[in-house]
């Protein structure tokens, strides 16, 4: 197997696994918008979101993630994932200060995923196993 093929397979696996995690958080917005509203208030300081704004965010996020999973519009969709996951990771800064309290240790799993998303963005031109031809 050539280096190009091996790298392509690794990047495909990274894209799919990042998509799965992000998709679950998006599905959570549809299934339990109250939970998403609580997360926005607790971690981002954005309170007062009702069901409609959460659903709108979920729809937009779902559409972007589907395009991301297909490996299309790489600069924009891969960049979106890096930014959204980065903001989410950094917003939980207080949990990193006390890693052994409650479920805080789980928050550290966000760091390698963010690193994977950054690597995927940087290597996006080498991500060759996509649906259709990417015209950016």
Indicate where each model-derived feature is located.
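Extended, low-polarity transmembrane helix blocks
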Residues: 1-31, 51-59, 63, 69-136
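Membrane-interface interhelical connector segments
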Residues: 30-46
């Amino acid at each position: 197997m050539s280096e190009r093929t091996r790298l392509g397979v690794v990047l495909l696996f990274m894209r799919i696994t990042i998509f799965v995690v992000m998709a679950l958080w998006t599905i959570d917005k549809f299934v339990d918008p109250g939970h998403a509203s609580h997360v926005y208030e607790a971690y981002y300081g954005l309170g007062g979101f009702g069901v409609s704004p959460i659903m709108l965010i979920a729809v937009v996020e779902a559409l972007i993630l589907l395009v991301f999973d297909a490996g299309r519009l790489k600069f924009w969709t891969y960049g979106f994932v890096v930014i959204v996951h980065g903001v989410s990771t950094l917003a939980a800064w207080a949990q990193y200060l006390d890693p052994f309290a409650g479920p805080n240790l789980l928050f550290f799993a966000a760091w390698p995923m963010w690193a994977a998303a950054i690597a995927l963005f940087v290597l996006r031109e080498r991500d060759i196993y996509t649906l259709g031809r990417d015209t950016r």
